[in-house]
């Protein structure tokens, strides 16, 4: 095993980059960068049925968007896709066959299904029963000849030691142990199409690439004993394994499911909605790990420096969309204006709102944004029809002082010339209404805000009125007075 730390992220090109896979990549990235090691990207594409066109490009593109870089990948190195390494796998399959540690299996899918059904009806744990048990060498040869004559293509199975014990000290979960008798019998290492199975190929790849640490989700725990069997059969030292806990939905307490519509689970979705990649990186880094303390906002460089594998959580990581949005808002609020405007610009352009007021509008709503696409609904006031009032807003506007407040404020606005109507002159007009009517606080500000914007909350009221313009503000107040 290599002395230098080498980790890998090995996705299958079967679709978009999910938040769970992004976390696996990110933790491997942080671990490698923290220790000055190598971060390797390898593509596991042996499952041809699930292969998605452009899946590999999508994975790498979204990892780059998150801010990760890598030392080795299919882009820079030959044979970093499993489909390009079939000769390598065959070499080790042939070795195991020659050493009697693996054998060709001619049992058909129909026979396997029938045996599983029998075992289930008998209340037995489903497992593969070696088809050659009880056969003499002559009978075995006749059986193989008969099957080959019938055109049956064999798989290759690894011979499992039923008495074997497979254990490791997990980086996250501590000591874990499996008995060979609980593995399910001899398992397939090469399919009928000549492709290796996942648990075989991954061992060959990790060994040849000198991977020192395998950090992955705990759904892979059941794969680990099978992989340890291959390491043992080939006489190789296994890497260190670390299995991160599940990600659960914070609202349901259950494993995060792609059917959970209250969460954004694919990195592509965050890109399309205009989240800052730094915010998404920060959020994912805290899913199952934390550096201690109360602070939650960290730059990529800080996370690399702080990352400590000993602080990987043993409890499930709760995916909280509200927390993601809170964190995103914090990043957008504190980002420079040019970066935020660049994120908002495509959404404004698509909505036909890239006007001379666009920069002012982004500046106005920047503190409220959780994602850049929100700039469109937030600016509806300036481009769309006046919104219907909510019940809470109607209740505010039902107060008997409202007509007085609106009428007097309207007079103050109308009295301002175009030159006098500036952002700085609006607040004094509101204070003048207070002085003239004796009405103050929420009873003063809230009716004006609702009459002008149709909302109880928003940016500073003078900013909204100034950007809306005197004429339109007066029009909105007139319309509201007519409804009272």
UniProtKB/Swiss-Prot annotation:
Short motif 'KMSKS' region, span: 255-259
Task performed by this protein: Catalyzes the attachment of glutamate to tRNA(Glu) in a two-step reaction: glutamate is first activated by ATP to form Glu-AMP and then transferred to the acceptor end of tRNA(Glu).
Keyword Ligase: yes
UniProt lineage: Bacteria, Bacillati, Bacillota, Bacilli, Lactobacillales
Family: Belongs to the class-I aminoacyl-tRNA synthetase family. Glutamate--tRNA ligase type 1 subfamily.
GO biological-process terms attached to the record: glutamyl-tRNA aminoacylation
Binding site residues for ATP: 258
Span(s) of short sequence motif 'HIGH' region: 11-21
Organism encoding this protein: Streptococcus agalactiae serotype Ia (strain ATCC 27591 / A909 / CDC SS700)
EC number annotated for this UniProt entry: 6.1.1.17
Cell compartment(s), UniProt: Cytoplasm
The entry's keywords: Aminoacyl-tRNA synthetase, ATP-binding, Cytoplasm, Ligase, Nucleotide-binding, Protein biosynthesis
GO cellular component: cytosol
A GO MF label: glutamate-tRNA ligase activity
Name this polypeptide is given: Glutamate--tRNA ligase
NCBIfam families assigned: gltX_bact
Subunit structure and binding partners: Monomer.
């Amino acid at each position: 095993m290599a002395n230098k730390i080498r980790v890998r992220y090995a996705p299958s090109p079967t679709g978009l980059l999910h938040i769970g896979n992004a976390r696996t990549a990110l933790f491997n990235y942080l671990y490698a960068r923290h220790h000055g090691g190598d971060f390797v990207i390898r593509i596991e594409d042996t499952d041809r049925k699930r292969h998605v066109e452009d899946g590999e490009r999508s994975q790498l593109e979204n990892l780059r968007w998150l801010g990760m870089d890598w030392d080795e990948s299919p882009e820079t190195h030959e044979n970093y896709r499993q489909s390009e390494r079939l000769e390598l796998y065959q070499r080790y399959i042939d070795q195991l066959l020659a050493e009697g540690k693996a054998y060709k299996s001619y049992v058909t899918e129909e026979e396997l299904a029938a045996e599983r059904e029998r075992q289930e009806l008998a209340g037995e744990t489903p497992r593969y029963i070696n088809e050659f048990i009880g056969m003499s060498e002559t009978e075995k040869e006749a059986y193989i000849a008969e099957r080959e004559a019938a055109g049956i293509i064999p798989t290759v199975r690894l011979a499992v030691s039923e008495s074997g014990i497979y254990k490791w000290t997990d980086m996250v979960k501590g000591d874990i142990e499996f008995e060979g008798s609980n593995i399910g019998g001899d398992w397939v290492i090469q399919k009928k199409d000549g492709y290796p199975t996942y648990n075989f190929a991954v061992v060959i790849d990790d060994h040849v690439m000198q991977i020192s640490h395998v950090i992955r989700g705990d759904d892979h725990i059941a794969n680990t004993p099978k992989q340890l069997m291959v390491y043992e059969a080939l006489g190789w030292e296994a890497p260190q394994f670390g299995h991160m806990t599940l990600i659960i939905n914070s609202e349901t307490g259950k494993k995060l499911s792609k059917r959970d519509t209250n969460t954004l689970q694919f990195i592509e979705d965050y890109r399309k909605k205009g989240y800052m990649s730094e915010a998404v990186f920060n959020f994912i880094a805290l899913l199952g790990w934390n550096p201690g303390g109360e602070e939650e906002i960290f730059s990529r460089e800080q996370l690399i420096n702080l990352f400590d594998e000993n602080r990987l959580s043993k409890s499930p990581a709760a995916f909280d969309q509200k927390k993601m949005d809170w964190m995103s808002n914090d990043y957008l609020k504190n980002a420079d204006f040019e970066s935020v405007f660049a994120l908002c610009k495509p959404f404004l352009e698509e909505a036909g709102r890239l006007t001379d007021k666009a920069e002012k509008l982004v500046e106005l709503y920047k503190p409220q944004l959780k994602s850049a696409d929100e700039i469109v609904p937030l600016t509806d006031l300036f481009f769309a029809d006046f919104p219907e009032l909510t019940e809470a807003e109607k209740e505010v506007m039902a107060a008997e002082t409202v007509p007085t407040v609106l009428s007097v404020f309207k007079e103050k606005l109308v009295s301002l010339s175009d030159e006098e109507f500036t952002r700085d002159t609006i607040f004094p007009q509101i204070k003048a209404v207070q002085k003239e009517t004796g009405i103050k606080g929420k009873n003063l500000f809230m009716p004006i805000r609702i009459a002008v914007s149709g909302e109880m909350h928003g940016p500073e009221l003078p900013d909204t009125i100034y950007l809306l313009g005197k004429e339109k503000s007066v029009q909105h107040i007139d319309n509201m007075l007519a409804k009272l």
